[in-house]
Amino acid sequence: MKKYKLSKKGNQLINMYNKMIDEGYFKVKAEENLSYVNFEIRPLRKNIKKIFKDYNIKSVLDYGSGGSDWNKSGFDVETEKSAKQYFELDKINKFDPAMNVDERCLSDCVVCFDVLEHIFISDVRNLLLDIFQYAN
């Protein structure tokens, strides 16, 4: 698979996110928060579960995965299942360059939450081409 290339500014942005991951960051009111801790897919889980079932999705590439832990129990508060169990998936792969995680491979579905708004406009085309090449 072809690897996309970011612009100089895009690479600087990834480096900034690396620093945020390592050191955390401060909000306006000086509340310290660790970055990359939300599982952005959770609020949409019921709709996504239906889509995954309708299209027989068994493998997912989480593009820009951040702190998403697909194997951690409690993803669904009603069943206490992990995201992998809840969606009945066989395989999860992750990609997050800011966290030095690169498990990109062909998958039944590529999910991408809270990513594109952080990409420089000049890098969007190459990033989308990269995402599409991993969707089965």
What function would you assign to each model-found segment?
Residues 37-40, 115-119:
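Short, flexible loop segments at the rims of nucleotide/cofactor-binding pockets, characterized by
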Residues 111:
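A conserved beta-strand element that flanks and buttresses the S-adenosyl-L-methionine
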Residues 1-107, 125:
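Conserved N-terminal segment of class I S-adenosyl-L-methionine
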Residues 119-135:
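A short, conserved alpha-helix within the catalytic core of class I
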